Regions:
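Gly/Ala-rich beta-loop-alpha elbow adjacent to hydrolase catalytic centers
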Residues: 167-175
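Catalytic active-site module of serine/aspartate enzymes centered on a nucleophile-bearing elbow/loop
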Residues: 367-392
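Short beta-strand/loop motif that positions the catalytic acidic residue
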Residues: 321, 327-329, 333
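Conserved alpha/beta-hydrolase "acid-adjacent" motif
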Residues: 334-340
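Short, surface-exposed "cap/lid" segments of acyl-processing enzymes
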Residues: 86-117, 128-129
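N-terminal cap/lid segment of alpha/beta-hydrolase-fold proteins
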Residues: 40-89
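Catalytic nucleophile-loop/oxyanion-hole region of alpha/beta-hydrolase
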Residues: 105-113, 126-164, 179-182
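Alpha/beta-hydrolase-fold enzymes
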Residues: 177-274
Length: 392
């Protein structure tokens, strides 16, 4: 009996030890799993504080981390701001793709965001891509985006040989276009974007007529700010062949200015007898207000113009995006409908869209009355930062 009791006791101890080992394995597994989220949340706090006007929070974040190292150098032939974290690399890299702003990489908000990413432990590159500081986007802009991404991924201080593409507005669209390029396969860890467009034809329709068509053909009214019309017009005129017509129309738009409440009024009232056929068709589209005429006017554009426009539309090509895509937008963005983000599922199976009232296009607005909106945006940032470090 004593031997049996001893055997039972021994078996009981073995069972308890086995249970302890299983429990320990579960705890360790959960710790490893959740630690990456805790780590990403801490980094998200650093990044978000860089774009919020919260002096106490910003001062605490700056005191907790080392001072980033800022430098300027050309990247793939484009002037760029490069911000490195304190300490030794390599680091996970972020290519911050700007929208259309005259100040480009020198805009204080852009520099603050780049420094926030660097304080959070990321190598950040912010180039001035062709056209963006002049309020236009062209195939040359898209090509330069791809070239910069390739060069950043190959930097010796880039961890894992991959770069995360983080874009705002048209910059987010450029990031998506680059991620479609087969030349960058295996060189991108993530695309994270705020308020992109996916189909420039839809954007043209909204900018000129205030409407767009859903996939089922229904016309939807969508009100946007006048600046969209200005950028769309400058980009469309830039597709014309170099010559007098392009110079004339670009000068007329430039005279109206980016702050004009009616940037297309001059084109809508001008005669077109002095213009060639291609320029006439461009003015005809930009001057039109009737959404039912849009399709015919778009079809009348020169073949070269429509080809250039398709090169600026992620949904127009046959490429696929194989990396995770995190997108965030407001419920009614002042430029691009949320449907522009949702539609990307066709080319980006790992696409996730966050809609939050904390975003007013590229601006983060936070109020005590709607902390849930900030929490939703925070979750978007946490997921993005965690994925960007997955190879670290």
């Amino acid at each position: 009996m004593q031997g049996k009791d001893a055997a039972q006791g021994f078996s009981g101890r073995r069972l308890r030890r086995l249970l302890y080992l299983v429990l320990l394995a579960v705890v360790v597994g959960l710790s490893i799993s959740y630690w990456s989220w805790v780590d990403a949340q801490a980094r998200a706090l650093v990044v978000i504080s860089s774009v919020l006007d919260t002096p106490v929070l910003t001062a605490a974040v700056e005191a907790a981390g080392g001072e980033p190292l800022r430098s300027s150098a050309p990247v793939a032939g484009n002037p760029a701001l490069i911000v490195r974290p304190a300490g030794e690399g390599p680091w996970p890299a972020i290519f911050l793709v700007n929208g259309t702003v005259p100040e480009g990489r020198k805009l204080p908000a852009v520099r603050n965001l780049a420094e926030g990413f660097a304080r959070a432990g990321y190598l950040v590159v912010v180039p001035d891509l062709p056209g963006l500081t002049e309020d236009r986007i062209t195939p040359r802009t898209a090509d330069a985006t791809t070239q910069v991404a390739r060069e950043v991924s190959a930097k010796p201080d880039t961890a894992g040989g991959k770069v995360a593409l983080v874009g705002v507005s048209t910059g987010a669209t450029l990031a998506l276009l680059a991620a479609e390029d087969p030349a960058l396969r295996g060189k991108i860890s993530l695309v994270a974007g705020v308020a992109p467009y996916s189909n420039i034809k839809t954007v043209l329709n909204i900018a000129t007529t205030g409407h767009y068509r859903r996939p089922d053909g229904e016309l939807v009214h969508y009100e946007v700010t006048p600046f969209l019309s200005y950028v769309v017009a400058r980009s469309l005129v830039a597709t014309l062949p170099s010559g007098e017509d392009r110079r004339t129309l670009a000068a007329e738009l430039g005279a109206a200015g980016r702050e004009s409440p009616h940037p297309l009024s001059g084109l809508r009232s001008r005669q077109t007898d002095d213009l060639g056929p291609g320029a006439k068709s461009v003015v005809g589209l930009l001057a039109n207000r009737d959404p039912k005429r849009f399709e015919a006017l778009y079809a009348a554009l020169p073949d070269e113009t429509r080809q250039d426009l398709e090169e600026l539309s992620p949904l127009a090509g046959t490429g696929k995006i194989s990396v995770p895509v995190e997108l965030a937008t407001g419920p009614h963005d002042k430029y691009f409908p949320p449907s522009q983000s949702y539609g990307l599922v066709r080319i980006a199976p790992e696409r996730r869209v966050t809609v939050t009232g904390a975003l007013d296009h590229a601006e983060l607005n936070v109020s005590l009355e709607d902390m849930q909106a900030l929490a939703t945006f925070d979750a978007f940032v946490v997921r993005s930062l965690r994925t960007a470090r997955v190879e670290d």
